[in-house]
Amino acid sequence: MIWLAVYDIEDDGERAKASAILQAWGFVRVQRSFYVGRMPRGKAADLLKILQRHVKSGHIALIPITDELLAKALELGRPPYAPLKPPKYAQIYVV
């Protein structure tokens, strides 16, 4: 399953730690506080527990999304998470 990880963390140290943890777990940064990764639901729950130990301020959400829904995303440009797309993914270009 694909997971979107988003956060709003005020503390700089906690924010840096959350970023490092997400990237260590294979998540790819899309924007400053938005990551995407692939893992089973049980592993995502484990990840959230680890994040909970290190982040005391702000909010973190792990949002599941299916391959089918990601394939329907409307995008412009090449996203950094393209390898997570199912093989049938067709890039949409707006002219």
From Swiss-Prot:
Cross-referenced Pfam families: CRISPR_Cas2
GO molecular function per UniProt: metal ion binding; RNA endonuclease activity
Enzyme class: hydrolase
Record function comment: CRISPR (clustered regularly interspaced short palindromic repeat), is an adaptive immune system that provides protection against mobile genetic elements (viruses, transposable elements and conjugative plasmids). CRISPR clusters contain sequences complementary to antecedent mobile elements and target invading nucleic acids. CRISPR clusters are transcribed and processed into CRISPR RNA (crRNA). Functions as a ssRNA-specific endoribonuclease. Involved in the integration of spacer DNA into the CRISPR cassette.
HAMAP family in alphabetical order: Cas2 (MF_01471)
NCBIfam families reported in the protein's UniProt record: cas2
Protein's name in the database: CRISPR-associated endoribonuclease Cas2 1
Organism of this sequence: Pyrobaculum aerophilum (strain ATCC 51768 / DSM 7523 / JCM 9630 / CIP 104966 / NBRC 100827 / IM2)
